[in-house]
């Protein structure tokens, strides 16, 4: 097992120096889902939520969150993102909304934190917009599906 990179020899937190690393094309894909009552999913599907277009607003929130990740995660590097895509699947059989975020950059460090942040904030936005009708929603399964680029994960 490798050591934690965000701590120095004295155990103090620090931002990893990526200055000498080459800029490469990097991609990360993350997913998660929010489980809800079937009636809540029906409201999202029909577009009749009182606060507006739930998935449209959640998509924008996810994109904004990816761009602000370094403001939220203390030791995360600010990155110039070249692409952020946030997509949703409505899963009637399990009464949930699945979110998938794909983030890309050309830089010295990966974008998995940005992809994870996009998914989390998009799902939080779904929760916020639907909590008036369903306070029992649960987010789960947030994880990185794919990471490409850099020396440990060559680009496709």
Swiss-Prot record:
CDD domains: MoaC_PE (cd01420). Keywords: Lyase, Molybdenum cofactor biosynthesis. Its EC number is 4.6.1.17. The keyword Lyase applies. The active site is at residue 128. Catalyzes the conversion of (8S)-3',8-cyclo-7,8-dihydroguanosine 5'-triphosphate to cyclic pyranopterin monophosphate (cPMP). This is Cyclic pyranopterin monophosphate synthase. The gene is moaC.
